[in-house]
From Swiss-Prot:
Any one biological process term the GO annotation gives: ribosomal small subunit assembly
Alphabetical list of PROSITE patterns matching this protein: RIBOSOMAL_S19 (PS00323)
GO cellular component, one term: small ribosomal subunit
Summary of the function given for this chain in its UniProt record: Protein S19 forms a complex with S13 that binds strongly to the 16S ribosomal RNA.
A Pfam family it matches: Ribosomal_S19
Keyword Ribonucleoprotein: yes
Entry protein name: Small ribosomal subunit protein uS19
Keywords: Ribonucleoprotein, Ribosomal protein, RNA-binding, rRNA-binding
Family: Belongs to the universal ribosomal protein uS19 family.
UniProt lineage: Bacteria, Pseudomonadati, Pseudomonadota, Gammaproteobacteria, Cellvibrionales
């Protein structure tokens, strides 16, 4: 179920202050964040956010299509290496 419209989008206060400061200074360095639950807002477009995936920070360049999604959707946490092939089937 989506979030109620009367509540508005959720974004951590510390991340919002970093985004506003970077937009004010036209700073292009990545903003490190552990807040995967924060929603992408229109004032984040054009910024690079380094989102933590549990092991490292993944750089995410925000564009217009990402607005309204959560940051965690763009930093994959699970690595799929494929199914193990059967040795008999290879011959």
């Amino acid at each position: 179920m989506p979030r109620s419209l009367k509540k508005g989008p959720f974004i951590d206060h510390h991340l919002l202050s970093k985004v506003e400061a970077a937009a004010e200074k036209n700073d292009r360095r990545p903003i490190k964040t552990w807040s995967r639950r924060s929603m992408i807002l229109p004032n984040m477009v054009g910024l690079t956010l380094a989102v933590h995936n549990g092991r490292q920070h993944v750089p995410v360049l925000v564009n217009e299509e990402m607005v309204g999604h959560k940051l965690g959707e763009f930093a994959v946490t699970r690595l799929y290496r494929g199914h193990v092939a059967d040795k008999k089937a290879k011959r």
